[in-house]
Design a protein with these regions (language model features):
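Active-site-adjacent loop and "lid" segments of alpha/beta metabolic enzymes
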Residues: 1-45, 66-151
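Phosphate/pyrophosphate-binding loops at sites that engage ATP/ADP/AMP, CoA/4′-phosphopantetheine
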Residues: 41-56
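Active-site metal-binding loops of divalent metal-dependent hydrolases
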Residues: 63
């Protein structure tokens, strides 16, 4: 956080538990929505106490990080809950394993259609940033979706 504070640059607060080796074992939640939101609230509060500017905070609910398929889908269905945090929201679901589970597709490069569906959903919820692999396809679908949702 010293770098963020020193250079006054934007950064992403991402919800996750553990690390890449053990995060899948840490996916037990009483209520994934309230647990993730509460965790993000605490992370934001801690960063603000370190004199980090509010305008530099971007929030990511951490799709795929210490969450199973049902948790990821529950978060996607309730993106409006995270918009209520009043910070820009980033969703990074591109080619994630849960998309592969839904599509029965093991090859991540063959999951772009699922990513496109999520990008459309993000447009509907006015999500600020989507992290994607196939930029051209997502740009095109978001251009159409934005015209539909924003007139």
């Amino acid at each position: 956080m010293d770098v963020v504070s020193k250079f006054n640059c934007p950064f992403v607060i991402t919800h996750s538990r553990g690390n890449s080796q053990n995060m899948n074992q840490l996916s037990n939640y009483q209520n994934v929505l309230s647990d993730v939101k509460c965790s993000l609230d605490n992370l934001i509060k801690n960063d603000l106490e370190k004199n980090i500017s509010e305008r530099n905070i971007i929030v990511d609910p951490g799709i795929g990080f210490s969450k199973d398929i049902n948790h990821n889908l529950e978060i996607m269905r309730n993106l409006d809950l995270f918009k209520k945090l009043n910070f820009p929201i980033l969703i990074g679901a591109s080619r994630k394993r849960f998309i592969g589970e839904i599509l029965n597709e093991k090859n991540p490069k063959e999951r772009d259609i699922g990513t496109l569906a999520i990008s459309c959903l993000c447009s509907q919820f006015y999500i600020d940033i989507v992290r994607v692999h196939n930029v051209k396809l997502n740009y095109q679908i978001l251009k159409v979706a934005d015209r539909i949702y924003r007139k």
